[in-house]
Amino acid sequence: MLIKIPSRSDCSESEVTSETLYLSRRRLLGASFAGLALASGLPRLGFADEQRYAGVESVPAPGWFAEKLPQTRWQAVNVQGEAITPFKDATHYNNFYEFGPNKGDPAENASALKAEPWSVVIDGEVGKPGTYALEDFVKPYQLEERIYRLRCVEAWSMVIPWLGFPLADLLKRVEPNGQAKFVRFETLQRPEQMVGQRSGFSVIDWPYMEGLRMDEAMHPLAILAVGMYGRLLPNQNGAPLRLVVPWKYGFKSIKSIVRISLVREQPKTTWESIAANEYGFYANVNPQVDHPRWSQARERRLPSGLFSPNVRDTQMFNGYGSEVASLYSGMDLRKYY
């Protein structure tokens, strides 16, 4: 079923911006990855409907992706003051610490990742556990284009047109039992292809882990994405399969997923394990709850430069409050951040 997202949550694909300002993330991950850098180059992408967006390169797609595109449900719903971030900027300003700590590292290093073949393990409190080849994993679902805001915890944001399907559709198919209260996600651990996982300076205990409460995972806005900008996901953006939860800070939208587990207890997520006072389990976008070292009241919508700042007020739940606020009814969102 096509989810019709209200206009205040949608963005027009006809408006395009670019981004030039790079902001280094906090120094928590520390030292340089110099000497470990891999050969640069964009990963294999897919022929699709990339002519809808400027500057999108064309590279042949795997058969399963090409077969699904003709039935894709494309969206283009206008909202005042929003603009889609250009493809090049969205693919060259990333946090993906498996490939390095700096914003340009994923685009430079992620070409080393071999995203084919790929399999996903489904386990835990489900009636249909198993290990699925990606093409079989995606086969039952019709792709939809979802134009979502992406708000990073670092107080910058983008607008990205994703291609994917509702996470809820997958969860229903694997038949969670009554003990399933949370969903835990796990990123690939393959240090021979992910330079960041080889660094002795990283504070991350690989593999990267994330989690959602079951009702959050079942919400129709939460999707599993396999593409963006009318084509296959680039490696640096989480190929071949990533989570997108638009009302939460970007680190919740885990990339390069290899395992989805339905569990009884709230999972301990990666950033929560590193600094729970800075990165809570819920991580809902909230302008009233600051990061300990910076304000969350405003954000830089990329592009944004010293002499041409593109700064705007941050919206509660990233502008999706009318859809998701009821999930947190009665909760103290200053405590459960």
UniProtKB/Swiss-Prot annotation:
InterPro entries linked: MsrP, OxRdtase_Mopterin-bd_dom, OxRdtase_Mopterin-bd_sf
Keyword flag Zinc: no
Record's comment on post-translational modification: Predicted to be exported by the Tat system. The position of the signal peptide cleavage has not been experimentally proven.
Enzyme type, top EC level: oxidoreductase
Protein's job: Part of the MsrPQ system that repairs oxidized periplasmic proteins containing methionine sulfoxide residues (Met-O), using respiratory chain electrons. Thus protects these proteins from oxidative-stress damage caused by reactive species of oxygen and chlorine generated by the host defense mechanisms. MsrPQ is essential for the maintenance of envelope integrity under bleach stress, rescuing a wide series of structurally unrelated periplasmic proteins from methionine oxidation.
Keywords carried by this UniProt record: Metal-binding, Molybdenum, Oxidoreductase, Periplasm, Signal
Key word Oxidoreductase present: yes
Assembly and interaction partners: Heterodimer of a catalytic subunit (MsrP) and a heme-binding subunit (MsrQ).
Pfam family, one: Oxidored_molyb
EC number: 1.8.5.-
Cofactors, names only: Mo-molybdopterin
Reactions accelerated catalytically: L-methionyl-[protein] + a quinone + H2O = L-methionyl-(S)-S-oxide-[protein] + a quinol; L-methionyl-[protein] + a quinone + H2O = L-methionyl-(R)-S-oxide-[protein] + a quinol
Biological-process GO terms, alphabetical: protein repair
Gene Ontology CC: periplasmic space
Any one GO molecular function term: oxidoreductase activity, acting on a sulfur group of donors, quinone or similar compound as acceptor
Signal sequence segment: 1-48
Protein name per its UniProtKB record: Protein-methionine-sulfoxide reductase catalytic subunit MsrP
Residues annotated for Mo-molybdopterin binding in this entry: N94, Y97, E98, C152, T187, N237, R242, S253, I254, K255
Organism per entry: Pseudomonas aeruginosa (strain ATCC 15692 / DSM 22644 / CIP 104116 / JCM 14847 / LMG 12228 / 1C / PRS 101 / PAO1)
Entry's family note: Belongs to the MsrP family.
Note on how the cofactor is bound: Binds 1 Mo-molybdopterin (Mo-MPT) cofactor per subunit.
Gene3D superfamilies, per the entry: Oxidoreductase, molybdopterin-binding domain (3.90.420.10)
Cell compartment(s), UniProt: Periplasm
